Amino acid sequence: GESTRPGAEPVPVAEEIRRVVPVIEALAVEGALISIDSRRAEVMRAAVNAGARIINDVSALSGAGALEAAADLGVPVILMHMQGEPGTMQDNPSYGDVVAEVRDGLLARAQACREAGIAAKDIALDPGIGFGKTVAHNLALLAHLDSLTATGHPVVLGVSRKSYIARIDRDVPPGERVAGSVATALAAWDQGVRLFRVHDVAEHRQALAVY
């Protein structure tokens, strides 16, 4: 309902709800497992009431009322790390130790979730590749995903077609980044990641099945 890509502008809450609820209701009828990607408590409540069963928040439930809403709704959550806001997060991302800071930031949010009543088994962590990070930051995180899998929380990885692949390989357009996406998924699998957010489902499924 609201894009969180670099440079994206916010969408009013009512408009976000208008966009997502009919789609969720239609998918829920078909028995699909649906995740709502939102930073807003009101959208989370409307989406879960419409049939969503997972909350994915790029701001790790740090927005007004978001943590309380997730706890009240009693569904699993995905906490993503993001430095800054979508509109400006890529302007000048800076870390002392990106691996440690992302891990510790996510663990702090996971602790807040547990204190709010969300079970540890229902909390997944996402390092937020491309969200307030340079290519060097992204590559460091990808090389040390085991720092997150070692926490015991499920780890979710979203790298499909992202721009770091183009920075490495001739600035190829999104449609030509499938091989790089699959390669990253295989490397992440070796570090214990089991949940992947992808565009090209068949290609990733086949690669992981063979691997």
Task: Cite the ranges covered by each PLM segment.
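Active-site-adjacent loop and "lid" segments of alpha/beta metabolic enzymes
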Residues: T4-L33, R39-E42, V48-N49, R53-A112, ...
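Active-site metal-binding loops of divalent metal-dependent hydrolases
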Residues: I129
